[in-house]
Amino acid sequence: MESLYQHFTQLLTAYYQPQTKVVLAFSGGVDSRLLLALLSRYQRDHEIPCHAVYVHHGLSSNADDWAYKCQLWAKQAGISCDVEHVSLELNSGESIELLAREARYQALAKYIESGDLLLTGQHADDQLETFLLALKRGSGPKGLSCMAESTPFSAGTLVRPLLTTRREQIEAIAQSLQLEWVEDESNQDTRYDRNFLRHHVVPELFQRWPSIHQAVQRSASLCAQQETLLDELLNDVFYRALQADLSLDIAELASHSELARARLIRMWLAKQNAQMPTQVQLSLIWKEVALAQQDANPKLKLKQGEVRRFQNKLYWVCDKAEVSGWQVHIQVDCALVLPEGLGELMLSTTTKQATIALPPQPELLSVTFNPEGLTAHPVTRNHSRKLKKLFQEYHVPSWLRRQIPILMYQDQVVAVADLFVDKAFSGQDCELIWRKPL
């Protein structure tokens, strides 16, 4: 226990930043139960804010009981605990494991503010299973890198303190501490690939090769190093191809080999936090989107979004709900949070680049995303035009035209964020600042 706590302390000390908190993903299983005990001790020793979150998927009839136990154990450990309910949209052919995992991390992300740490309980056996599953899928070095001890997550960092510790060691320590934990009955169902490996494959591998966990950890680490090196070698090329609006220049891509091009597209999608495409999808991005006829409007649907082409550039378009019906009043010098992760908007009077004159009644200013039927007269133009035409003239891709904030004064367009100010509202009172998500 002491050596594990020492390792735990070293990890948290390395990653913890002052004025932040530590969040524990707490399922109540033996892994997170031991992490709760370690975190409770660390909190007493270092006096830092800690919080636990139980994600309730509703997949088991025991979930309510597990949630109750998790809150009880957390209270006994002196750590606050929330129960976060999620619902899964089960579609034919989709993995329940994958859907549950995605929903769990989306729920946990809501608790992570800038610099916070998220602790999860993956251990050495999980790493071995992940490696074998990646082999089964035919993954390359990226997939075989498996899980890192730490990785960026939401606005903070995800840390896996148990990643080099075997399951049987975790159980032995938990028993020595007389801890109770929950047993998820689904972990015995060998219809799931991971459970099949856990119960039928990994024990045989370990019996034959007792150092298999360390060997896999070493291979995963070497694969991760190769991935990092590839990114470093292509970094300059990547940033030549990457445009200010996060699109990717097709001409720059075309000047490189097929292998380098595929890697650059993967780097681009990774920067957008998109799920990695398959080899077939990667080929289609180039052949059917990038190289489509010039008069075509090509796109390729992937999970979470689609790749599109506009003016010889590739764009990643995230799936977003329709926002053109959204309209909210905006106050001067107060940040307005936009829907669907579209960022923040502010009318700032403290800027040195003021371009807008405030109207007689600023309280009537509002923000919309619907350009339908609106006209405007940009300061730099000789006459007014429909916003639809202006978007074309300003080379705004069609799919973005209902995701750009429009500042309104009653029924008049005051400004379109990042594009122009209407001539009737030109002045030096304030500036419209759109802080887009990274």
Say what each PLM segment does:
Residues 49, 80, 180, 211, ...:
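Short coil/loop linkers at secondary-structure junctions
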Residues 199-200, 204-216:
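Conserved anion/nucleotide-ligand pocket segment
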Residues 1-203, 232:
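Core alpha/beta nucleotide-donor-binding catalytic domains of modification enzymes
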Residues 127, 215, 260-264:
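Residue-level detector of well-ordered alpha-helical segments, enriched
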Residues 5-30, 51, 86, 90, ...:
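AMP-forming adenylation/ATP pyrophosphatase catalytic core
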Residues 188-195, 213, 217-221:
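Internal, active-site/partner-interface "lid" segment
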